[in-house]
Amino acid sequence: MLSTITSFLILLFFVTTVSAYPFEENSFPRLQDTLATGTKPGDPPKFGGGYDYVVVGGGTTGLLVASRLAKAGNSVAVIENGTYPTGNLTTVPGYNEQWFSRVLPSNWTDMVNVWPTVQQVGGGEQQHMMGRMIGGSQGFTFVDYFRTTKGAMKRWADETGDDSWTWENVQQYYKKSFKFTPPNNTARPSNATPDYESSQIVGSTPGPLELTFPKYAQAFGSWVKLGLNELKAGINRVFVEGDIKGASWILNMIDSQTGNRATTYTAFLEPTQKDDTSKIDVYVETLAERTLSNTPPGSDPVTIGVLVKRWGMRFPIFAGKEVILAGGPILTPQFLMVSGIGPQDHLQEMNITVLANRPGVGQNYNDHILFGVKHAVQVETTSVLLNDTRKWQECERFKAHANGMLADPGPDFAAFVDYPEDIRQNLSAQTKSDLSQFPSDWPDIGIVSSPLGVNGDGNHNYADLVCIPMKPISKGTIKLRSKSMDDKPVLDPQWLKSPTDMDTAVAGLQYLLRLYGTNSMKPILNASGKPIDLESSNKDDLIKYVKNNYRTLNHQSASCRMGKRDDPMAVVDSKGKVIGVDRLRIADPSAWPFLPAGFPLGTAYMFAEKIADNILSDHGSDKDEDEDELRVEL
């Protein structure tokens, strides 16, 4: 039985022992779950026009950048292949588990891009899943918020040759997007009180997007907290201060009044659309096919717009200042390559005219994997939601009080740790050498408690302990299948291809088993005391378990790596500008130099804020004098 969490993403917590609930065998929550798509009244007409900026991708970073540019007095077009989500499956935090379960929402294919990989370690294809809707993947992923480490940002600054990326210099951007509401300690149990310092979370000027803690806490997480304390994991203050080692409750992006998800769609785009002084048009159900450009004699190509396809019609949308790519680490390199920007040999193989030879496009693909160990437990988990009566009660509780099991995304307690010395001693010499290349504050693994149980057997409460190796060595590739954006690219993440990655994964699995074996966790484990599907702890069996149970965490990044302008494998410079092409920039994690320590969503917000600031510094709000001339030359 594969772990539910093993299919996807992150976190959990609380206490109280309860007996098992009478579940309905292999059923699935059915009440109050709705999902639909729609086009808003303000949607622009079928044919485009001219704007100061064109943003390709209406997800997390794209909407933030577009809104910042529009608020500064610029006209902005957002191109999104999906549409607006409606219904509560994309708003209620507790429904995110359904997107990763064996029974998906009936029309989920309208809202999600799924890309199969080539065969990976362990045999067979796996799948990447990312949002295809306004707001992107934040419509269904966990709403957890983390930052990376000081050492990771020092490495970022060193690799790009730009000290503006050091921890001290990016703090303003980490804090800029957010406002913070302290936890409701009346609603939360006393043993679920987070340790934090407000001034470390947000700045003196609050942003539009809310950070807080759910009013509900899962029972499993506080038992995990006790076990981690027994293993001397240490304590952390909500993973925002530049040193993430230790254990903590997790900050969430949640509206403290409604309990719903807080996203760039709700916090940035919607207010901007309602502001009569801002000019922002969102082209939904619109596929960006390639860039439009001119190449003046003796100069680099100049990007002047995007060719799009909407409802069967092709037309240009022009950009007087810049085109900004925010399609994510899979679509952005694909879009660059079909536009003629990428490895010359591969483009010629695809019969694409080479606009700029950038060998690094689609290379250096970074990702986190995860694997979970499931256990029957004697505390309530989301397994109880298999009972329709209980599910209805939880729905009513959420609607009335923004509380209850649906108010919590599930995983809400986590830790980042290094391997204990006795486990580290068993690593190979090559593994030890590879791990030593990372900054000292970069943890070996992340551990997440996950009480997500709807894929159980219907007879018990189930939960997972989840491990995420933090120092992957393997790097993947993205290549074109054809010259069309309609065709999915060829993905080869190369997960676990490096022997070091398998070695560290086995060490992480050993840590999970040790955590289950603590005296602190024994009171909630089932009578057998054995994890599901893991009968032996010898190394060969652990390797087999990892191969059979690992999944992507969908933390893709660095496929259009940022670097110094004289680095032949760099795709963008330290301001996100595509090297060798004018007026083209990247504002999503594909442009990161590497996948940093921790979980990346907080860093994605920081990155988008900094890129938006760079754009405004470069251009201001004045119209470019040569905008009309460039359009005539098309």
Annotate each language-model stretch with its function.
Residues 3, 7-634:
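N-terminal redox-cofactor-binding region of secreted/periplasmic oxidoreductases
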